[in-house]
A protein has these predicted regions:
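Structural detector of well-ordered beta-strand residues that form the stable sheet scaffold
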Residues: 8, 29, 85, 114-116, ...
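Phosphate-binding glycine-rich loop
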Residues: 1-6, 20
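Conserved PLP-binding catalytic core of the aspartate aminotransferase-like
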Residues: 187, 201-205
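A short helix->loop->beta-strand "cap" motif at the edges of active sites that frequently abuts
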Residues: 5, 26, 79-83, 109-111
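Hydrophobic alpha-helical segments in the ANL/AMP-binding
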Residues: 16-23
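Conserved core segment of the aminotransferase class I/II
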Residues: 106-184, 191-197
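Active-site phosphate-binding strand-loop segment of PLP-dependent enzymes
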Residues: 29-104
Length: 205
């Protein structure tokens, strides 16, 4: 993770990926996500890069990679000595069989991938800055895990304790039931919107 790294990002995607790396002075390459590739660019279209960002389900398109598609990205990362930064913020909305909720559903991904996730989508924690990052020990012989731990303990003291307790409650039996109820409500709203767009003949992702 140096200033000289080349960064590969799908286009369109969550803009912070680009902004963060522009501020660091890194070279940015764009991988078009289009209707032709179902908004899911694959590694056979990708140039060499040191780091690739994958947001799945994607913000803003909602397109979601299957486990099989992510296998190809993991193989690409190994062949290119690259690291995948996998943003799983919207994984809680994945219900279709075969679609991935985590990059680590792919065998070997722990050797090339870092996963980040947020409580803002699954539990409505928007604004509390609470989430988690998984940096596997298998990645770069554990060096990145140690570097990340040192960085976090030096520059960040964690979110407020009351927020941590709220996040802890998310994973209780009662918390998961309540969250599932809310997610079902969101999905119903999405279905209503999709039906209205279909009726009006409006194309959407």
């Amino acid at each position: 993770f140096s200033q000289d790294n080349t960064i590969l990002v799908p286009d369109p995607v969550y803009p912070v990926y680009v902004d963060d790396n522009v501020m660091a002075g890194r070279k940015i390459l764009y991988l078009p996500a289009t209707a032709e590739n179902h908004f899911l660019p694959m590694p056979d279209e990708a140039p060499h890069a040191d780091i690739v960002y994958i947001c799945s389900p994607n913000n803003p398109t909602g397109a979601t990679y299957s486990v099989e598609q992510l296998k190809a990205w993991v193989a690409w990362a190994k062949a290119n000595d690259a690291v995948i930064l996998f943003d799983a913020a919207y994984e809680c909305f994945v219900t279709e069989k075969g679609l991935a909720r985590s990059i680590f559903e792919v065998e070997g991904a722990k050797e090339v991938a870092i996963e980040v996730c947020s409580f803002s989508k699954i539990a409505g924690f928007t604004g509390t800055r609470c989430g988690y990052t998984i940096v596997p020990q298998a990645l770069a012989d554990g060096k990145l895990n140690k570097m990340w731990l040192r960085r976090q303990t030096t520059k960040f003291n964690g979110v407020a304790y009351v927020v941590q307790r709220g996040a802890e409650a998310v994973f209780t039996e009662e918390g998961m039931k309540e969250i599932q109820h809310n997610l079902d409500y969101y999905r119903q709203n999405a279905a209503v919107i999709a039906a209205a767009l279909d009726e009006a003949g409006v194309w959407y992702c």
